């Protein structure tokens, strides 16, 4: 069965703060209790202010193969270099969440990390020409996508594949099967305080072969 979900239709006109339940089942989960992360609906999605933390709907859980995509607009320059983007493979979301996230930052770099509770392991990071840097006003618009297929996970920015990881890899020296880890909840991740708009959040399972990045 093909599942396609576009967030725009799910968001009523409400504001959501840290630890509160998001609209239509969406939730905000901050990294620490002292953190503020606010959500405000926009015409095509929502605006996140604050962080670090994640925004997700527990019902948006998918199994490989699938893809998740959203357009991110950094509205102004953050106080320091900050990664923001998508997360996928979310499990144990109410206790010690485990997921992989894919973010971009102001210097044109991307970051892929695995998080399990308080443990964070870096999988890859690099600069890439496809990532649009902020203008003089601190604004930048980039579309991020993660494509999860049987043999690889592809990471795309503005339609270009910036990285790909095989279904078998290692995190912190421990071998694991990625396909066992990447099924789960999909959502949005912010690494540090920032003001960012997220439009057209979308996931699809499965997706067509000719749409895949790898």
Where are these regions (language model features)?
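Secretory/extracellular carbohydrate-interaction modules
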Residues: 50-118
